[in-house]
Amino acid sequence: MEHHLKIDNLGPIKHCSLDVSNYMVLTGYQASGKSTIAKVIYYFRSVKDELVAVMMKQFQSQDYSTPLEDALRRHLMEKLYRTFGVAAVSVPGMKISYSYTKDIWIHISVGEKRKNCRFSPQLKDFLHSLDNEYRTGDVHAKLSEVNGLIEYLAKKTKEFNLLFNDSYETIYIPAGRSILTLLSSQWNYLYSTMDDAQKSLFDECTRDYIENVLLLKSLYSRDYERKSLDTLTDAHLRDLSKKADTLRNFILKGRYVCENGTEKIELSNSSKVDLNFASSGQQEVVWVLNFLYIRLITHRPSYFIIEEPESNLFPASQKYVTELISLVVNAGHASLVTTHSPYVLGAMNNLLYASTLPTDKLKEADSILSKECWISPDCFSSYFVEDGVVSDCIDHEIKQIDSSKMDAISSIVNDEYDRLSMLMWDDKGRNV
């Protein structure tokens, strides 16, 4: 069963009900609510991580006075405010719900007088049994041992993955990345000097992104990518890593390096440019590429929520970044992409089309578009967000994104051009 999401009256979204597929794209006008949907999905898919955080906090404080169910509920409500802002989640009639399976779900709603966070009966039963388990003497004694807590939480994480029907780590990559990249050399200092109140000025998704970037940057400074490649023994994954690296170089026009804390782009002629002096396109896309590539070569199944991967990129690079995302998805990961770009949507359609060709044409198709990047229609979905509602924009007959969603503005521009060109001719067809 796929995860299922419902939203009512949250921000610009009036109503939304959709299945969360393995590979999904949201398109539509700016400020239509694409990011709102993406953030709600991130919020619910990170519940299992929040459960681990709540358990860790209770153990470290040795305060078990609050039942785990109540502690998690309180934690999720606080995160709701940090993710969407108090005003957005205080509107009477606001509802968000997420079904992981038919038996495991979470519903959050706002009434006239109170907010309500409900867990399904089976989820409540699981939390109660977990509560009883890790408070018992035997388990508690093991947790006090060296590495005991880490081993216990690692075991529980696998159980949570099964419970929530989700084996992926969720990574949110927001839009507006260039300013964060531009300041990256100062982030370690700036972030370490902020108190909790100052950090709360960032929405939860942006804050998580910053922390993930800082962590990955520290790994790159220790040559983590090369070491990961050196230990990669899976032949198929090594082949995919080479193809992914080729696409990455096409997009970035170089290679990201971090030397003594200084981030640079190493160009093809071996010269290096400090990242804060690189192009806006490179600054926007560099961490998209780094996250995709590292998770690919370390084979850590991830659910990538990527906002506007096309930002500040030339159309050819938009095509390549779409192919890279698709390659990574096919390697055992998953992704949600928000986009305004007809080039991204067009590239996706080509990859969908390639996978549906007759068997005797697949070899030729592979020579045009690498089969590792093809998109299976069975695991793909696309939605158009407009006027607060979401509509399926897949043409199910041909199994592609409805071309009218991509070509709407082109037809307007072409019509305007035709009308302007007509002004150059008089009623008798003579050029004026």
Question: What would you call each of these model-derived segments?
Answer:
Residues 1-205, 346, 352-373, 391-392, ...:
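P-loop NTPase switch/coupling surface
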Residues 364-401:
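C-terminal structured domain segments
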Residues 318-330:
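Helical segment within the ABC ATPase nucleotide-binding domain
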Residues 338-340:
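H-loop/switch region of ABC-family ATPase nucleotide-binding domains
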Residues 231-254:
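Amphipathic alpha-helical domain-onset/packing element
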Residues 41-44, 270-306, 315-320:
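GG-anchored amphipathic helix commonly corresponding to the ABC/SMC/Rad50 NBD signature/C-loop
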Residues 301-303, 332-336:
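Loop/turn-to-beta-strand initiation segments
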Residues 11, 24, 279, 310-314:
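Catalytic acidic motif of RecA-like/P-loop NTPases
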